[in-house]
Amino acid sequence: MAHTFSCSADAPLVRTTGGSVRGYRFDGLDIFKGIPYAKARRFHAPEPAVWDGVLDATSYGYVCPLLEMPKPNGEMLVPHRYWLMDEACQNLNIWTPALDDAHRPVLVWLHGG
């Protein structure tokens, strides 16, 4: 099933400590993808990510670099190996039913690897 969305003047826009972020609405949710939460600095303490202007948060950020899997079942184990990889993979994705001050449950998923 294909899904489409469009960014328009009423696309959700939020201000964060790093800068402004514009997402999109789909199926009753405000969605923000690929928001950086730290700078990629190998072997150094993390630094907050900041940006000028409005960050386009309508697509996923980079995934962390992975080694190629030489076995035939590699597709099943690492299906995202075709996604864009970069050390700047410190990003998060947010789905929320509304942009207000209501208290809502939060699910945090820390992936392995």
Task: State each model region's role.
Residues A2-G113:
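Non-catalytic accessory segments of hydrolases
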